[in-house]
Amino acid sequence: MTERMKKIIFKNLIISETEDYIIINKPPGISSLHDWSSETTIITMAKEYTEDPQLCHRLDKDTSGILVIAKNPEAYRNLAMQFEKRSVEKIYHAVVEGIQDIEPIAIDRPIYTMSKGKVRIDFQQGKPASTLVKPGEFFKKHTLMLCKPVTGRTHQIRIHLSSLEMPIVGDEMYGGKQLYLSSLKKK
């Protein structure tokens, strides 16, 4: 466990809380569910905070964003059904390399899961995957892309953007380079 993970206090992640749900801002670098490489996960921290927490959805370990945790089985079923029926609109923001002045597109490329959680585009063995993508804002050497996954495959947005030579900055697993704040100047 890194020093950074030791310092995370679950209560400080909470954006909103009701009798049924806890809404948190998940930081990058921590798994939502159990992870063989780390004992600290969002769900283990939530179990110390409330009696019966259940994740209504998940975010990849290195992804930050809003995460909803149900406090009881009925609340979980209610929101899980909304996710299953795709009535929840999910939009991810990703800073990618280069100026991507493109029209909105649908990336339809099948994804195959390899060992150790990495994925690749594979037209023979992959499972169908679709992501809607459009540019949001332009910087000097980067573009903020707005991404809406139609399917929910592991690392879907990361591999789809990388497959079009638009790797997410900092995502070294799929070809992204480290980002320095000085390079995020407005175009």
Please identify what each model-predicted range represents.
Residues 1-130, 136-139, 161, 182-184:
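RNA pseudouridine synthases
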Residues 39, 140-187:
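Pseudouridine synthase
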Residues 134-135, 146:
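Beta-strand-rich interaction surfaces with strong enrichment in secreted/lumenal proteins
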